[in-house]
């Protein structure tokens, strides 16, 4: 059975709608170039919702973006780039006040380092009043990245209002906690993440995020807690170790694929887009695990994300057919295989 069987009352067709902030990344052309040094950089569109929506479009989905930009050159560049990627930007609000956030990247031996210039960015000032319920109602899936919940009250309120609209109209809710180190975590922030996760139909944390959300270490306990919150489909991305997908009593693992990692920017957002696309295509759980794993892997092999590293549907299918990407069903310790549901 395919993933659509998890959501019997969901709309059979429709677009994927992403809510969030567009950013512009300045990516160095050399991995040894530091922010304190002169050198050449490439401008590329970023922001979780921007990367997600472009990835969904590249994978064959009809996808739209909800957000707010300014009328500055950086905003125009971001919107035009996303639109050229096949995303419907007609519902992006154009504001006379402010510009989109900027991020400058450097590659350090211990990982990536971002210098953000996004405080009070126009994108973070998207509000519930900027939402059009008719637009949300027409979607099949609404996707939100969790880091929006910690930017400010304005966009946080928009996120929860958009979910309320989605629930009123039978729109599936996809949520990626996207917990960022530069934002606060714990206390009220954790409660907001848990509140949003409990309203999601599709949940995609990393393993570290799943542990933070649940307070558990064992993966079976983690899945029990996450499903207990409400999501029917849970996908846990594990960086180089691949991914786990859980639904309908089944758990499938797709091990990591050995490739040279150039830049992991956007891999999680593209993985989330792939997961939503798998639901649209009604893939069986094992095929979905392989598909998502392949998408996340391919993104890591190139620098940048939008217009540079996001793979096409054909590229993903080619990697799936190569035999390098596997998936296997996992059986809970101490449970008979026949007792562990067949599910999706």
Describe each model-derived feature in a short phrase:
Residues 2-17, 164, 215-344:
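Conserved phosphate-binding/catalytic region of the ribokinase-like
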Residues 20-22, 147, 177, 270:
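Active-site metal-binding loops of divalent metal-dependent hydrolases
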Residues 56, 206, 268:
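Short, conserved phosphate/pyrophosphate- and ester-handling motifs at nucleotide-, phospho-/glycolipid
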Residues 134-135, 195-196, 227:
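Structural alpha-helical scaffold elements that stabilize or flank donor/cofactor-binding regions
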